[in-house]
């Protein structure tokens, strides 16, 4: 399945909404997109996974990489996810401790 993204700026945060599957075939494209944003100085990122059908270990690795890159440049990466299967992946891997996972974009931007 093809991956599609939409990007919008809200209250100082760059929100990247992702649609499709984030896997070994598509994660490199998403990583390139997020890296480009950080290189542009857009280091406060919200990754909205509400439209993601599937996320594999390659996708998880890409998210960790993006988080590190954003924080290295003085920013942060927050995740929006309500899909139980994907949220469970964050819990099983312990990434829920390193990542801020929120139920909505508004909550992620507000930080609560």
What are the functions of these language-model segments?
Residues 10, 84, 106:
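Residues that form or immediately flank small-molecule/cofactor binding pockets and catalytic motifs
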């Amino acid at each position: 399945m093809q991956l599609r993204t939409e990007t919008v700026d809200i209250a100082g945060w760059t929100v990247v909404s992702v649609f499709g599957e984030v896997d070994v075939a598509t994660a490199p494209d998403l990583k390139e997109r997020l890296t480009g944003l950080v290189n542009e100085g857009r280091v406060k990122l919200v990754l909205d996974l509400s439209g993601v059908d599937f996320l594999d270990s390659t996708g998880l690795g890409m998210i960790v990489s993006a988080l590190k890159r954003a924080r290295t440049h003085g920013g942060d990466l927050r995740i929006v996810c309500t899909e139980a299967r994907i949220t469970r992946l964050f819990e099983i891997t312990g990434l829920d401790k390193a990542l801020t996972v929120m139920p909505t974009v508004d909550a992620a931007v507000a930080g609560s």
